[in-house]
Design a protein with these regions (language model features):
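Alpha-helical "lid/cap" subdomains adjacent to substrate-binding clefts that gate access
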Residues: 1-34, 199-229
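Conserved AMP-binding/adenylate-forming
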Residues: 13, 17-147, 153-156, 176
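Extended hydrophobic secondary-structure segments that form protein cores and membrane-embedded regions
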Residues: 35-37, 198-199, 240-244
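Short, internal active-site loops enriched in acidic
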Residues: 42-43, 189-190, 203-204, 244-250
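AMP-binding/adenylate-forming catalytic core of the ANL superfamily
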Residues: 110, 115-116, 138-234
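Conserved C-terminal "lid"/linker of ANL adenylate-forming enzymes
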Residues: 184-187, 226-279
Length: 279
């Protein structure tokens, strides 16, 4: 909070002053750290904002191998913590098939876009149309032109009322909890409607460090998820949660293999190997 106030004071909201005021923090990070560039995975907005407030310029960017690779990036003079900044020069970024919140698929056009996948014409045709590359990522632009990534198109959950749920939106909230290692949303059918469940991989050391029993821990999680529900529209409400300390199945790039996880959940559910709790 003090950092926020310092950066807003007239005449001293500059890097040199911030680095001097927060010298102890910077020294704790080695003393010479001036710039952080983050890509591949999102950085929590509060983390980026905090580092910038301390005088360590923290920039997020976005790109893919198919786009050589940078599509957009923050600039030191134009930071928007949580976004991936604005498109690079000569790169055109549009949002296709927007929903009511302005979220749609990110499409890229420019000299940085690949010619195609080697010897894979069908795969190339699926992602490149009229020279425009369909990334499969979902995002939106804010009023200042900053690009925000909201998830992957293939991960979108379409409810029976036609509403879209972007699992990463809710998972990112749950993943911030001190006892959460990772989480994943999925659906179950109830009274001919789809409802949301969440699998939470918890940190066993949290129970050891706090001294709470597992039963007490379950009640804590239930209460926190109920509080999260209060801030979400009804169709995004979580109905049940599964607790486990077993890591999820991931790709080599540490992305959760959702389909395999759902198969695993179905098996555990039948064999009663997971803790199933209502909210």
């Amino acid at each position: 909070e003090f950092a926020r106030r310092v950066t807003k004071l007239p005449g001293i909201g500059n890097l040199a002053v911030r680095r001097k005021i927060f010298r102890k923090i910077i020294d704790g990070l080695g003393g010479h750290l001036r710039l952080i560039i983050c890509g591949a995975a999102p950085l929590l907005p509060e983390t980026a904002a905090g580092l910038n407030d301390f005088g360590i310029v923290t920039i997020q960017g976005y790109g893919l191998t198919e786009t050589s690779p940078v599509v957009a990036a923050e600039r030191p003079e134009d930071l928007a913590a949580g976004s991936v900044g604005k498109p690079m020069p000569s790169v055109e970024v549009t949002i296709e098939n927007k929903d009511e919140n302005g979220i749609g698929e990110i499409v890229v056009k420019g000299p940085n876009v690949m010619m195609g996948y080697l010897d894979q014409p069908e795969e190339t045709a699926n992602v490149i149309k009229d020279g425009r590359f369909y990334t499969g990522d979902l995002g939106k632009f804010d009023d200042e032109g900053h690009l925000w990534i909201t998830g992957r198109k293939k991960n979108v959950i379409v409810m029976k009322n036609g509403k879209n749920v972007f699992p990463e939106e809710i998972e990112s909230i749950i993943d911030k909890l001190p006892y959460t290692s990772e989480s994943m949303l999925f659906t179950r059918e109830k009274h001919n409607e789809l409802v949301l469940w969440v699998k939470i991989v918890y940190k066993p050391e949290y129970l050891e460090d706090t001294g709470v029993t597992f039963a007490e821990f379950v009640q804590t999680v239930r209460g926190v998820l109920a509080a999260i529900n209060e801030k979400l529209p009804k169709y995004k409400h979580l109905h049940r949660f599964l607790l486990t300390d077993e890591p999820m199945i991931k790709t080599t790039t540490q992305k959760v293999k959702r389909n395999l996880e759902i198969e695993k959940i179905n098996q555990q559910w039948q064999e009663e190997l997971c803790y199933n709790n209502s909210i």
